[in-house]
Amino acid sequence: MKFRWNSRRFCQESSLERQFIFPRGIFMDLELDAVRRINKLAGQARPVDLMMDLITRYGHWAFLIYGILLWFAPGKNQKHRRESCVAAFLAVCLCSVISLAVGKLWHRGRPFTRDRQIWNFTGHKANASFPSNHAMNSAAVAFQLLRDRMPGCRWMACLAGLLAFSRLFAGMHYPSDILGGGAIAAAVHGVLNKPFAAAFIKKLTGALSLLSDSILYIGKSR
């Protein structure tokens, strides 16, 4: 429901209506205004626009490429690196399932559908806005990499933050979409790093390592 300020209507509303409707409407308007201000930065410097467009469209592929390199890179700590990859992958899967469920229960329209002045320069479709899948999944990966102290983890964390900002810059998400995605990622990260989950991840990593190494060996022997 869109909030529009009307002083006469507000005075006529009951105290109960004011208690629940007014704060929610004000919060949503403040969020929309924040997106509007950030989105106005677009179009002022073409190099920045191109960079943000690339990051918001394709930034998530950097995490996939990083994961592949981390998995196949040789070294003494390969087992530990692969466990980190599996944990990060499971986190993304669980986060995506939660996001899908939330989207079915609550469809929040994207900022550019509420205000035509917001420039949707990526041409993104008007599907559910909450939570931000890109911000959520990149945060889930970054949390795991930082915890396991993987090489380049800080750079990947910075990329996750930049990817989240780019979604605001492009007018595709509200700040609470980003924060909500981060909260889901943090919760999933906490669960997957419990002892019971860690034991499962070790077994799964062993099985996947055997499979990938066997395929690689067969490919080299041909």
Pin down the residues of each PLM region.
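Short, Lys/Arg-enriched N-terminal segments with co-localized hydrophobic residues
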Residues: L16-F27
